[in-house]
């Protein structure tokens, strides 16, 4: 995966951009967080768990979908949302974690070393374990993975948590 992505003319600029964003998050957010009591971010801000850890501040990560690794619910960004006996949610989470680790882990660990923090082994688990995960989706659209060991709550959909829908059709 690494060599294919590094040699891809289409993927290389994205990878470079993402790693640059992570470096800038460390550079810019640490001084800001030192002046505040808590860090609130989306789940796509890759450096924030390490930044909050370094600054010894609590972190609330928000997500508009179930975005914590588990065995029952697949990642919201990957295909196969219906049960599949071969490509299970656990396999999809492992695949997503491998892709995410490839894209962000080395850059995060480079910055963690710069700030005297131990390296992380797995970005997905590190971020989930080091934050309070606040899920912004309607409780009426389903529950969460019973295997989640991370601290979380469902806050409801930020635009309209009371809309009507066909529950039978949704379950299919």
Residue ranges and their predicted role:
Residues 4-8, 61-70, 155-159:
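Short, mixed-charge, low-aromatic patches
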Residues 1, 69-76, 163-166:
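Short, charged, surface-exposed secondary-structure boundary motifs
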Residues 21-88, 140-142:
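Conserved nucleotide-sugar donor-interacting segment of glycosyltransferase catalytic cores
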Residues 96-172:
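A nucleotide-sugar donor-handling region in carbohydrate enzymes
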Residues 2-49, 87-123, 128-129:
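Conserved nucleotide-sugar donor-binding subdomain of glycosyltransferases
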Residues 1, 84-88, 138, 166-167:
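Alpha-helix initiation/capping motif
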């Amino acid at each position: 995966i690494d060599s294919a992505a590094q040699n891809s003319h289409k993927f290389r600029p994205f990878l470079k951009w993402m790693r640059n964003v992570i470096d800038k998050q460390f550079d810019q957010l640490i001084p800001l967080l030192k002046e505040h009591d808590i860090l609130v971010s989306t789940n796509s801000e890759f450096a924030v768990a390490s930044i909050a850890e370094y600054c010894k501040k609590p972190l609330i990560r928000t997500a508009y979908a179930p975005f914590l690794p588990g065995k029952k619910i697949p990642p919201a960004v990957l295909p196969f949302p219906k049960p599949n006996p071969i490509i299970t949610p656990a396999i999809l989470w492992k695949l997503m974690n491998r892709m995410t680790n490839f894209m962000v882990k080395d850059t995060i660990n480079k910055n963690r070393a710069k700030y005297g923090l131990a390296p992380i082994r797995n970005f997905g688990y590190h971020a989930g374990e080091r934050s309070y995960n606040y899920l912004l989706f309607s409780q009426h659209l389903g529950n969460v993975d019973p295997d989640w060991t991370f601290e979380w709550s469902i806050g409801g959909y930020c635009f309209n948590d009371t809309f009507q829908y066909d529950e039978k059709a949704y379950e299919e």
